[in-house]
Regions:
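Substrate-binding pocket helix/loop in short-chain dehydrogenase/reductase
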Residues: 99-100, 107-112, 206
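Active-site helix of classical SDR
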Residues: 123, 160, 168
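Alpha-helical segment proximal to the catalytic Tyr-Lys
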Residues: 128, 173-174, 234
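Residue(s) in the substrate-gating loop at a strand-loop-helix junction
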Residues: 144
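Short C-terminal tail/terminal secondary-structure segment
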Residues: 149, 237-265
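Short, small/polar-rich loop/turn modules that mediate ligand/substrate recognition or access, typified
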Residues: 176, 181, 236-238
Length: 265
């Protein structure tokens, strides 16, 4: 069997910390040169760049605003520096907690622009390049378990992630003929700055409502992304893979809750 081999050139958005940094580092360990983006944390992006270069790979850095209609230009810019593009990891995103009744249109649009519009524009630019080169490729979208199940106080976030999950399937159908796979990774609660935790918290925080009893570690997300980016995943496309410690299995245990405090934001 001959498996198409895409270029070992990857772009990871939002790689200045957390899951993005872990993914960039693991891809570098797997032999990829990496382009990374950041929004405001330039120092964090510099640390990620140093970590990639310590692994003997090239790394280029660019600031990116996912709410801009021109955000796809960043993908083109990094791809030009890399000399091509074989893998895009749409990792960057944002979150917001609050009642839907209080959600302003501006905040709603900001959430959808960051978590859905921006990833679409990045994927579109990446796919065009992959089609043009004719060597296939991989697109991995980081969604959330809330692509699949709702969360109180996160209407805009859940809507955007659900949309990104459906976009993953639509792109997978359209791009399969070009040997481009498109998949999603749906993390549960992961110990990152976005969730107010440090990486070691993954193994010292207690989570009774999760079958594993703890949050996830960024390396556990990066490992799945790296698999999907590899030739070993060449027959897997259009799927969303929850990496949540079994959290989504717990729905039937809602009757075990002692009170209705979960309703309060």
């Amino acid at each position: 069997m001959t498996v198409p081999t895409h270029d070992r050139l990857a772009i990871v958005t939002g790689a200045d910390s957390g899951m993005g940094r872990a993914t960039a580092q693991l891809l570098a360990s797997d032999g990829y040169d990496v382009g990374i983006t950041f929004h405001t944390d330039e120092a964090g992006a510099a640390d990620t760049r140093a970590a990639v270069e310590q692994r003997g790979r090239r790394c280029y850095v660019a600031r990116q605003d996912l709410t801009s209609p021109d955000t796809g230009d960043t993908v083109d810019h990094l791809a030009e520096q890399l000399g091509g593009l074989g893998v895009l990891v749409n990792n960057a995103g944002t979150g917001h907690r609050g009642r839907a009744l209080d959600l302003t249109y501006a905040r709603w649009r900001e959430m959808l622009a960051t978590d859905l519009d921006g990833p679409f524009l990045c994927a579109q630019r990446a796919a065009r390049r992959m089609v043009e080169t004719g060597r296939g490729g991989r697109i991995v979208n980081i969604t959330s378990v809330h692509e699949h199940v709702p969360r109180l106080g996160a209407a805009a976030y859940c809507t955007a992630k659900a949309g990104l999950g459906m976009l993953t399937q639509c792109l997978a159908l359209e791009l399969a003929r070009y040997d481009i796979t498109v998949n999603a990774v749906a993390p549960g609660e992961i110990a990152t700055p976005m969730t107010g935790m440090d990486e070691p918290d993954a193994f010292r925080e207690d989570r009774p409502g999760n079958p594993t009893g703890r949050p996830g570690h960024v390396d556990e997300i990066a490992a799945v992304v790296a698999f999907l980016a590899s030739p070993r995943a060449s027959y897997l496309t259009g799927r969303s893979i929850p990496v949540d410690g079994g959290l989504m299995l717990m729905a039937a245990h809602g009757h075990d809750m002692a009170d209705g405090s979960w309703r309060e934001l």
